[in-house]
Amino acid sequence: NFYADYSGCGHWRMIWPELLLNCYGKANIQGGTVMIGDRNFYKGLKTIRIQRQATESQLNYIKWLKTVQEECGFKIIYEIDDLIFKEDIPFYNKFRFAFEDPSIRQTSMEIMQICDEITVTNNFMKEYYIEKTGNKNVTVIPNFIPKFWMDRYYDLNQIKENYQRHKSKPRVVYCGSGAHFDIENNVKQKDDFFHVNDVIRKTVDKFQWVFVGGFPLCLRDLVQQKKIEYHEWNNLVDYPKA
C-alpha cells in the first residue's frame, strides 16, 4: 500500500483495512509513502495499491512499476475516494487549489489509465471514472467503519434514553468534512448547505441542529447564540467520543 495521506481517508481506505487483514492473517500487507526503487522488493507480491497519486514523479514511479510488473506479475490498483479533476471540484472546496495545476490532471489521468484496476467508494464514482479515464475495470469498495473505532459507543439502552430525552426536539447532526462549507467565501456561500440553510434557520427551535468540525458561515450568529450546537474538529482517536 502506498498512501496519499495519513488523515481520514488514509485510515479508513488504506491503513485500517491493512491492519485488520494483517491481524486476522488474511494477508501480509506493508504500507507507507516511500517509493521503493529496489526491484527485488516486489518479487512475490500479488498487488500494489496506490492511493490518489497525481504528481509527475509519482507517474514516473508507476511507469517504472509497470516494467517491474512484467517480471513479477503483480496487479497495480489505484484507490480514489473523491473527485480530483478540477472541472468537477466546487470552487468553495478549500482543497481545490491542490488540483488546479493542469499537469496534476494530466498525470493523475495517465496513472489511472495505466493501472490494472481502480477502486472507488460508490457507483456514482465508478461511472464517473470509467467515463473520465476510459479504464473500465473499476470496483466499488464502500467505506466501512471498523468496530474497534466505534463499537464501544453503541449502547442500546443509552440510545433509548437519548430518544426519550430529545424526542420533543430531535437532534440532527452533521459531522462530515469542512470542505463542504464555503469558509473563504469564494462563491458567496453557495456551497453544499446553501439549499438548506434557510430551513435550518427556520427550524432552529424545532430541531437541535448539531455541527461537528465546521458549519455554514451564514449561520454563525446561531452558533454564537448557542441555538446551533457546535463541536470543533477532533482527531480520529477522540472523534467517536466527541
How would you name each of these model-derived features?
Residues 1-55:
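N-terminal pre-catalytic "stem/leader" segment of glycosyltransferase-like enzymes
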Residues 34-36, 122-126, 212-219:
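Short, polar loop motifs at secondary-structure junctions
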Residues 51-70, 79-80, 85-87, 187-189:
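An aromatic- and histidine-rich active-site surface loop
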Residues 67, 71, 97-118:
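Membrane-proximal helix-turn-helix segments that form the acceptor-binding/catalytic region
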Residues 113, 235-242:
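Short acidic alpha-helix that forms the nucleotide-activated donor recognition element
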Residues 124, 141-144:
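Carbohydrate-associated surface elements
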